[in-house]
Amino acid sequence: MFDFEYQLKVLPEKPGVYLMKNSSDEVIYVGKAKILKNRVKQYFQQSKNHSEKVRVMVSNIAEFEYIITDSEMEALILECNLIKKYRPKYNILLKDDKGYPYIKITINEDFPRVFISRTIAKDGSRYFGPYTDYSAVRETIELIKKIFPIRSCKRYIRDGQKPTRPCLNYHIKLCSAPCGAHISKQGYALIINDIVQLLSGKDKDILDKLKNQMEEASNSLQFEKAASLRDKIFAVKKITEKQKIIMGSFQNEDYINIAKDEKDSCVQVFFVREGKIIGREHFILEYTSDEREYKIIAEFIKDFYGGAAFVPKTVYVPDIEDKYLLEQWLTIRRGSKVEIKVPKRGEKIELLNLVKKNAKLTLEQFKIKYLQDKALYEVALAELSDILGFDDMPNRIEAYDISNIQGVDSVGSMVVFEKGRSKKSDYRRFKIKTVEGANDYHSMREILRRRFQRGIEEIQQIQKRNLEFSSGKFSVFPDLILIDGGKGHVNIALEVLKELNIEIPVAGMVKDDSHTTRGIIYNNIEKDISLDSNAMKLITRIQDEVHRFAISYHRTLRDKRVLKSILDDIPNIGTIRKKELLKKFGSIESIKKASIDQLLETPSIDKRSALSIKEFFAPNEL
């Protein structure tokens, strides 16, 4: 039993980080302190200043741990890392970093590529972001490829390597073909530099250059080239058309402000580069209404700039706690001095007020959509509860399906819906291991037994403190199981649950002859559901999703098997070489088209095996 009185007495009067845990050993809050003894004690003292959120959190604390650091700055850095690791329930969090796209430029390569990435790696690449609108980022990438003749292939191209035949993109002027030595490393670097400048908001020089080239082409009667350059100018303007000139001070500055309602907050960021607003992003922080605004902004800065690709010289905010400490931390992140400023007058405060207005509008729009969606989901779950005779709505629903073609590459899938919404982070896939041929019943038995047996084992490990709650992949059980199938499939599921001494209701999702969702079977009775009801729409969506997820995994396994079976017939190609070829080229078609030199770039492929591959696919060409 954790002795709170004793542990609070022995807390050190030093800086550090504290971790609050619940009865399941789950880390529910991470915080930093200049003096651990003073800060941690505050949570367990009666105070009117405690928000409702803090009171609820404290009621769930079963124990706490702490880590001593040499300074408050070290505590801040450690706090950021631990929050990123545990994603604690009561910390103010942005969506998982994986949800936000970045634009990545591989400037560490001889001939860099430009594409969308979900993560930042310390690989020497240049990143822009994070952005919240994936479709807008994708459109920007497509426009960049229209403006600049850069490569879109995934091949690794070295400067000075033997030239190969360019692809179609070169012939339609979408690529400068470094693979065929049609452009030097230095010439390609100039193109990449223009892209970096454009994404940084420095478009004036690019537009001037394109306009001069267009005039030269027009004067020399090269009208087709002039028209192409005109289109590129339009594309550049489309990328920058939302950029608004605001001030004469050419600084790299971010403006952060916040709007709140009775439940949630919206933090809006405006990015200013060279006197122009080059972009803005918003972040909805749910259940933060009782937090102080200056605290939310401080937490946001740690989370946002902890994963941001760029830290500006100046950050403007309406108010903030730990200002000087955060300035030091941002300075470390940037590599040069960063200031956090609270403007009181002039154009800076005017822009900050504009950011707040946008945050308020965004929050209102979010709330309207959220309430509409929430109402629909709640109605659907309420209808489903009535149909099944439940006292409470099923908060977590897990659905299962099996996919194979004539018993080959059998797979199972599990999708999860919480409060009516899909929760993709909890989706799981199963490769059938013990069943031969096409036997859906035995396959379903296998995946359900594996899923719930693993869940029981994880719960036991969590109870023994050998596993952190947040690390468990199967430890959360559903309120309802839906099986893609009829009575037979449902009975198989019930048998497995009975074997494991687990009580969870199971229903089957049945389809008619045209493969359209018809209804559900529960307690061996098919329930009549109106096709227009919200419950039917939810069931149909779940059934379509679990089927899609199973089919996609089945196709992946099938494609890998087909690739391997073809490569098995090539002399001198063993298991290791086969894996290396698939890793480098990805498809049989790419391997077929590869030159001897390209094949030799593959680890473990020597001249003899490269010749074997070429002879196998094109014996008449050697």
From Swiss-Prot:
Any one GO biological process: SOS response
GO terms assigned for molecular function: DNA binding; excinuclease ABC activity
Signal peptide: none
Domain UVR: 204-239
Record key words, sorted: Cytoplasm, DNA damage, DNA excision, DNA repair, Excision nuclease, SOS response
Subcellular location: Cytoplasm
Domain GIY-YIG: 13-92
GO CC terms of this entry: cytoplasm; excinuclease repair complex
PROSITE patterns reported for this sequence: GIY_YIG, UVR, UVRC
TM stretches of this protein: none
InterPro entries cross-referenced by the UniProt entry: DisA/LigA_HHH, GIY-YIG_endonuc, GIY-YIG_endonuc_sf, GIY-YIG_UvrC_Cho, RuvA_2-like, UVR_dom, UVR_dom_sf, UvrABC_protein_C
SMART domains to which the protein is assigned, alphabetical: GIYc
Function noted in UniProt: The UvrABC repair system catalyzes the recognition and processing of DNA lesions. UvrC both incises the 5' and 3' sides of the lesion. The N-terminal half is responsible for the 3' incision and the C-terminal half is responsible for the 5' incision.
NCBIfam families assigned to the protein according to its UniProt record, in alphabetical order: PRK00558.1-5 (NF001824), uvrC (TIGR00194)
Subunit annotation: Interacts with UvrB in an incision complex.
Family the entry assigns: Belongs to the UvrC family.
PANTHER family to which the protein is assigned, alphabetical: UVRABC SYSTEM PROTEIN C (PTHR30562:SF1), UVRC/OXIDOREDUCTASE (PTHR30562)
Name the UniProt record assigns to this protein: UvrABC system protein C
